[in-house]
Amino acid sequence: MRHRCRVKKLSKPADQRRALLRSLTTELIRHGKITTTLIRAKVLRSEVEKMITLAKNGSLAARREALGYIFDKQLVHALFEQVPTRYGDRQGGYTRILHTVPRRGDNAKMAIIELV
């Protein structure tokens, strides 16, 4: 039974799931918009919002936490410079998920996740 199970497992072990979410988060912050499956987009939303909230905080501890999660150091630097001006007045809801056509090979539900 699935009672009180809070983590979407994405059919992967914990270390692979963590690596997948780190890479998807890095690419979404780098490009601003990516196409992925709907479930991955929904799980990715919470991770990206955490990183943007850290960047809004702007402290040294928040920067170090972001550096431990996002792969690219220059990307973290750019994130911490741009986010306070871009999302300064917004209290959450930094991403948007748009449903698209299913994937051709296996008919998986696809979505575009983008930064607002």
Curated annotation (Swiss-Prot):
Q: Which SUPFAM superfamilies match?
A: Prokaryotic ribosomal protein L17
Alphabetical GO CC annotations of the entry are: cytosolic large ribosomal subunit
Q: Which UniProt keywords apply?
A: Ribonucleoprotein, Ribosomal protein
Single GO BP term: translation
- Gene3D superfamilies found in the cross-reference section: Ribosomal protein L17
Q: Name one Pfam family in it.
A: Ribosomal_L17
List the disulfide bonds in this chain. Answer: none
Q: A GO molecular-function term, please?
A: structural constituent of ribosome
InterPro entries per the record? Ribosomal_bL17 (IPR000456), Ribosomal_bL17_CS (IPR047859), Ribosomal_bL17_sf (IPR036373)
Q: Does the keyword Protein transport apply?
A: no
Give the UniProt family note.
Belongs to the bacterial ribosomal protein bL17 family.
Instruction: Kindly state the subunit structure of this protein.
Output: Part of the 50S ribosomal subunit. Contacts protein L32.
Which HAMAP family does the record match to this protein? Answer: Ribosomal_bL17
Query: What is this protein's name?
Result: Large ribosomal subunit protein bL17
Q: Which organism is it from?
A: Nostoc punctiforme (strain ATCC 29133 / PCC 73102)
